[in-house]
Curated annotation (Swiss-Prot):
Keywords: DNA damage, DNA repair, DNA replication, Ligase, NAD
Active site: K125 (n6-amp-lysine intermediate)
Protein name, per record: DNA ligase B
Gene name of the record: ligB
One GO biological process term: DNA repair
EC number(s) per entry: 6.5.1.2
Length: 566
């Protein structure tokens, strides 16, 4: 996980913010409770990962959660947490400490880091687990997990099964390397497939007592550090290739400009590769002697991570949208977050049942992704607020296909949805009559039914805030067009359960008199739809609407003229 790399403070200061960084308006007691709960969750994640090799949460959600904890501690003057690497520390000292890496927040931070530097190299940031490899007389004899950077655990028991790792050098020399053990993949495109839990899989395998040969063969090695190697990066890479580590040279590119680094970052992000990566590493070709390395991020190496696939967002409110048919859709309004350059402020929860199952309340921290790279999707709750705020959800039984034909209390949303559907492209196709217009008219008390807008005049429209004389004239023109719209557009706009391509015959009176059996003689109308049609035409509110439309002279709603006997 990313917390194998940095101490919490450095981590927080160098990770890009996915959520707004303003301090919450909390009491000290609430801040302490929220921070304590978040710390407990992070500690549990750390212990599972470091001791069992089990990742309970996606790496980037861990990153953002750790960042949020430090942010809260800074906001409220709380004591900083102990190093998240405490549980990773093992009994074996590394010959040379693992340094870790600073994370650069954005392109501007990368530009600042590169300013004035020469001899910069870029590499993919392999998404695996770091280790020290010790060769004696050309033979790999010891494998030590990164641990806390100073001491790690002994993974040497797995060496015989690591068939894809160079275990015998072409020369009988002593060698100490640092690198990334990663999951070998086939044609993996990071931008499409994400991390594929590659890091967690490798960590889980290495935490086992024993690997099978097949399991061991799924683990590869990328060497990124040769503490006592040649001074120049190009020389180190060339010699590593000769020693049996060609990937180090193949995936290391010298760059002169920010644009060069950005181009390679984009290339590796979208190209098929045999490994997962979560960004790129920028490193200087020259570095201090290994004797000066420390278990913290140095000046000569930095990471520029890929965009988040999931963002951690705080729920501000949950509101319930009632549609024309009575379907209730909970909408989570969140503290703005950014995914793939898209600013997200709200996300649909799909259904009332899903909201109830997730039990999302204001203050909860949720994971948000982009479905199809465009539509925000709430994946799950990551952290629950300590204080569970009550929410008043609409009663499911109150709203259905034949409810809310007037804006009575609790019916405003569905009523406005009905008007919007009526005037929209599915119905009358009236210009300038979106939900905002209908809401203003309803709030002003000018529209209290599905038809009284037909009687409005310019004087009353201009009394509504936000409606000018020009807007009033345009609305009246739209309303006037409604009078000449065909009967089938009115019928569909009012919500009659008929298909878009169904050929209608007869007027309102004839249709209202049909039985379910008679409706079933019409092509493409089955038992269920026929019952819905009978229920629609029999509804008292719908009959009242038809009567008012007949009085307004709308085609199809007036009864046929009586036949005169000769």
């Amino acid at each position: 996980m990313p917390y194998l790399l940095l101490f919490a403070m450095l981590f927080a200061l160098n990770t890009p913010l996915a959520w707004a960084a303003s301090c919450p308006d909390w009491t000290p007691q609430k801040a302490e409770a929220e921070a304590a709960q978040l710390q407990a969750t992070l500690t549990g994640w750390d212990e599972h990962y470091h001791r069992q090799g089990i990742a309970l949460v996606a790496d980037e959600l861990y990153d953002q959660s750790r960042q949020r904890l430090v942010h809260l501690q800074q906001c409220f003057g709380l004591a900083p947490s102990p190093s998240p690497l405490t549980s990773a520390r093992g009994p074996l000292p590394h010959p040379v400490p693992h340094t870790g890496v600073d994370k650069l927040a954005d392109r501007q931070a990368v530009a600042r880091w590169m300013a004035g530097k020469t001899g910069v190299w870029v590499q993919p940031k392999f998404d695996g687990v770091a280790a020290s490899l010790i060769y004696r007389q050309g033979q790999l004899v010891q494998l030590i997990s990164r641990g806390d950077g100073l001491q790690g655990h002994d993974w040497s028991r797995h060496i015989p099964q690591l068939g894809a790792v160079t275990r015998q050098l072409p020369q009988a020399i002593d060698l100490h390397l640092q690198g990334e053990l990663y999951l070998r993949l086939n044609e993996h495109v990071q931008a499409k497939a994400g991390s594929a839990n590659a890091r967690g899989t490798v960590a889980g395998l290495l935490a086992r007592k024993q690997l099978t040969r097949e399991q061991g063969n799924t683990i590869g090695l990328f060497v990124w550090g040769w503490p006592h190697g040649p001074e120049r990066q190009a020389d180190r890479l060339a010699q590593l290739a000769q020693l049996g580590f060609p990937d180090s040279q193949h995936y290391s590119i010298a760059v002169d400009t920010l644009e060069d680094a950005a181009r390679w970052r984009e290339h590796w992000y979208r190209s098929p590769l045999p490994f997962a990566s979560d960004g790129v590493i920028l490193r200087l070709g020259s570095r201090p002697p290994a004797e000066r390395w420390q278990a913290k991020a140095p000046y000569w190496i930095a990471a520029w991570k890929y965009p988040y696939v999931q963002a951690l967002a705080e729920v501000r409110d949950v509101r319930f949208r009632v549609g024309r048919t009575g379907r209730i859709t909970p909408i989570a309004h969140v503290q703005p977050v950014t995914l793939d350059d898209r600013r997200i402020t709200q996300v649909s929860l799909g259904s009332l049942a899903r909201w109830q199952a997730l039990d999302i309340r204001p203050g909860d921290q949720v994971a948000i992704s982009l479905a199809g790279l465009t539509i925000p999707r709430l994946e799950h709750v990551v952290h629950r607020a300590v204080e569970r705020q009550p929410l008043g959800a609409p009663a499911p039984g109150r709203h259905h296909a034949l409810s809310c034909w007037q804006p009575s209390e609790g019916c405003e949303e569905q009523f406005i949805a009905r008007l919007t559907w009526l005037s929209g492209k599915q119905g009358l196709a009236l210009p300038r009559t979106g939900p905002g217009t209908w809401r203003r008219l309803v709030d002003a008390g000018l529209v209290t039914s599905m038809t009284d807008w037909l009687q409005l005049d310019a004087e009353r429209l201009q009394q509504v805030p936000g409606i000018s004389s020009l807007t009033a004239a345009q609305l009246l023109g739209s309303f006037d067009q409604a009078r000449s719209r065909p009967f089938d557009q009115w019928l569909r706009g009012l919500g009659a359960p008929i298909g878009k391509h169904l050929q209608l015959t007869g007027g309102w009176q004839e249709m209202a008199s049909r039985s379910a059996g008679q409706w079933q003689t019409v092509p493409d109308i089955g038992v269920k739809r026929s019952r819905q049609l009978v229920g629609f035409f029999a509804a008292a509110e719908v009959q009242a609407i038809a009567t008012r439309l007949a009085e307004s002279g709308i085609e199809g709603f007036s009864p046929p003229p009586e036949r005169i006997e000769q």
